[in-house]
A protein has these predicted regions:
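Low-complexity, small-hydrophobic/phenylalanine-enriched stretches
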Residues: 1-27
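Extracellular jelly-roll beta-sandwich "head" domains, especially the C-terminal globular C1q domain
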Residues: 25-160
Length: 160
């Protein structure tokens, strides 16, 4: 169809060149935590968005939320014990360049979200999301890494 038209029924397409929205999601790697049945997140999730369309796109990263835990240390010897905290660092790199760095201590969560422009013809974009333990004790949580890519367009929407 090379002109405007009105479709007065259902349009079904199993293949569309120039998809409007694509999404991927993956959990972060985890290993056994410092105590019992706890887990500690640690590792990298890498997402590559290929520059394979002739229109501008936006990369949308919904909030990735991460936190450590507070725990009681009974103490021993010269260590009086008390409440201790696990902590985590979180970094995001775009094509190898650090674009965000966060950290959290204890149960107070840290988060990262973004909207990144991807102009057509600008080359592929590789995003690396890295979570790492800070300190000796490991126990914490992180949500899955989700990335949404959409055609950049402002028709039919307004923001003020």
């Amino acid at each position: 169809i090379n002109e405007n038209c009105t479709i007065k029924g259902m349009l079904e397409a199993t293949q569309v060149r120039g998809d409007f929205v694509k999404a991927v999601s993956k959990p972060f790697p985890k290993k056994t935590g410092s105590w019992g049945d706890t887990e500690t997140p640690g590792g990298t999730v890498t997402v590559t968005i290929y520059d394979d369309h002739n229109f501008d796109r936006q990369i949308i990263i919904p909030p990735i939320i991460f936190s450590g835990v507070a725990y009681d240390d009974p103490g021993s010897g010269n260590n009086p014990g008390g409440t201790r905290y696990t902590g985590y660092g979180f970094e995001v790199r775009k094509n190898g360049v650090l674009i965000a760095s966060r950290e959290t201590k204890g149960a107070i969560p840290g988060s990262y979200s973004a909207v990144i422009d991807m102009p057509s013809g600008g080359g592929s974009v590789t995003l690396e999301f890295k979570i790492f333990q800070k300190g000796n004790q490991g126990a914490g949580n992180i949500t899955d890494c989700t990335v949404i890519v959409t055609k950049k367009a402002a028709s039919g929407i307004s923001i003020r």
